[in-house]
Amino acid sequence: DSYPRIKRVHIRFQNEARLSAPLSGHFYGLSRSSSAGDFNCLAYLQDGSNGKLFCSMLLQLTDPLDCSEETILSIKEIPEAAPRGLIDTSPISNLAMADAEEAGFVVSGRGLVRSEDCDNAGNLKAPAYMGKASDSVPNLWTHLMGDEQVSDSEGGAVAEFKKTFYGVFKEGDVFTVLSGLVEARGKIQRFAHLFFRQGDGQLIMSAEAISVRFNLLTRKASEIQPEMLKRLESKKLNLNS
């Protein structure tokens, strides 16, 4: 259990990586004077042949890595990695389960933390949180739009994603995921997910995502249709109270 603990993650997906594109991965420590806030590490994937950025990930580790001078850079050197749409302070981090349900969050997932998803210390591995957030989206979408809105020609593409940890799930924990729509306008939708531990009701992780409405045939972003927007607006979270 000596690995650095991840506290916050902010991911941006800048470009689509096509099949057979050569990938080059990089990991750096961030200088304290880099205007990156509390983030102290940066990882990114780029095209190994031309340097085109595919995705980037800012991390805040509770135990910063001891990086050599050659592996420390400023966020200003890769401005595309800086937060863009998810930069405000979100009220969802302070919500208890009952308050979240009152605000319009719905149950989108439940389960048991299994041993095969945990590390040697019995903690749920970081990638598993992302997977469970992804698994909750179809259930949220059914709540928002119904099964009849499933389409082979249109979907969504996540452009930005952030998650904040307040604790850790352990092997044997029972969890509940609550999800909701924060905003819908133009070509974008903004979703939120809350991961609670059953029993004591502790909020373990909150996550938010900005998704772009995406035409799967043209591979381009598209406007949310007026009828769909109307239905989405009627199911939007009430986070003002």
PLM region spans:
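Catalytic strand-loop segment that frames the active site of acyl-thioester-processing enzymes
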Residues: 1, 85-147
